[in-house]
Each structure stands twice: as C-alpha cells, then as structure tokens.
A protein has these predicted regions:
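Short, well-structured alpha-helical interface segments that form or flank functional binding sites
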Residues: 31, 75, 140
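Hydrophobic alpha-helical interaction segments
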Residues: 125-205
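Short beta-edge/loop segments at beta->alpha junctions of small alpha/beta modules
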Residues: 1-72, 108
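Short gly/ser-rich loop at a beta-strand->alpha-helix junction or flexible surface loop bordering the NTP-binding
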Residues: 37, 43-52, 62-121
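Hydrophobic/aromatic-lined pockets within catalytic cores
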Residues: 26, 85, 150-154
Length: 205
C-alpha cells in the first residue's frame, strides 16, 4: 500500500490503531507503519497507535489525543480546572480519568496521566471540538473537581483545601455548591462527601 492511499483513508480520524486499520483492510502489512514512522510520516503514540505527523503543529491536538490514547477516558481534574480558570497553575500534563487501570504515556503531543474511577461514576463529561473538528471527551468543571477530591485523599483539613487554590470568584460563577453535594454520594465514598462539605465551607459556595 502507498502512503498517500493510507493517509487519504485515515487522516480524518486523527490517529490510527491496528484495530481501525483491520476494520478497513483484512490484509495489511504492519511493516508499513514502521517504515512510515521512520520516514517521519507517522508518529507512534503508544504500542499499536499512530498519529499523522501533519497534526503535530495543530493547536489543541494534544487534548484531542487524550481520549484516543487510552479509552474509555475523559479529560478531568487539574487540566479541566486550569482550562476553566479555576486554578492558577498552567497544567502541562493532560490529566484524565478512566475505568481501566491507572496508566501514563508520553509522546510528542505531551504527557498523559490516567487515573481509575468506578464505572458507576464515569459520567459528567461531554464531547467537544478540540482540534480541527476532532472531538474529545472533557469533564464539566463540577465533575472535574469531584474527581480531583475523590482521587486525592489528602484534602481533609481547611489548610489542605486552601492548597487547591481555587479562584473564589470564578468558582462562584462556574460551580454551584449544591450541585457538588448532590453528586458526591454517587461515588459511594463518605470521605468525598465530607471533603465536599469542607470545600463548600472553606470557599463559601
């Protein structure tokens, strides 16, 4: 197969997995992938998953890749809070949650961290256009904050809660405190319910 034929078929997907290729071609020489990677046409994201090098300079491509590199997953926690202006830090790692085991990946698009949550709380996200029409799964700010409090067990005092450094003005405009209290019990974790109550007290929401 010639590279141009391959590109014409799969470019719209953003990245290409062995499984995706197999759904179109019953016979495919996988050595093509190594050859095209060595030639700079493709970028290896992880074992069995490749992206077109053309996408490398596309704004938002790192975010769009997050839910493709490890699925099912959605962007959450620090990355979403930073993008919403809720925390002051510039988050360089793409933080996501998944129902699969915890994992980390690094490639030319960035560093990716995936942490495990229960399947019954794998909700509270939406599909958004992130790069050249490519969709990605992104948590709402409220869900991102709940995931953060659930996955980090050290926010148990007022001082520790202040260390999240939430912008109080943005917080009051973005997240309803009662919404956090209503959603927290679905995690079936009393510690999270307690952290939400503490957060509401500390930040006045």
């Amino acid at each position: 197969m010639k590279y141009q034929e391959f590109r014409d078929r799969f470019f719209k997907f953003g990245c290409v997995s062995i499984e995706l290729i197999a759904s179109f071609y019953s016979v495919f020489d996988r050595h093509n992938l190594k050859r095209w990677t060595d030639s700079g046409y493709l970028i290896k994201l992880k074992r069995g998953l490749y992206a077109f090098s053309d996408w490398r300079q596309t704004a938002g491509m790192g975010e769009a890749m997050a839910s493709r590199i490890y699925a099912p997953s959605y962007l959450s926690c620090e990355w979403v809070l930073a993008r919403a202006g809720l925390i002051p830090e510039s988050v360089v790692q793409f933080t996501s949650v998944t129902t699969l085991k915890t994992a980390k990946f690094s490639n030319v698009f960035g560093d990716y961290s995936y942490r495990t949550i229960k399947p019954q709380v794998f909700w509270g996200y939406e599909s958004r256009p992130l790069a050249s029409g490519l969709q990605g799964q992104v948590a709402t700010p409220a869900k991102a904050l709940l995931d953060l409090l659930y996955l980090n067990s050290f926010y148990n005092t007022a001082e520790e809660m202040e260390e999240i450094r939430l912008d109080r003005e943005v917080l009051s405009e973005t997240i309803q405190g009662q919404e956090l209290s209503d959603l927290a019990p679905y995690y079936e974790c009393q510690a999270l319910v307690d952290r939400v109550a503490l957060l509401r007290k500390v930040y006045g929401i």
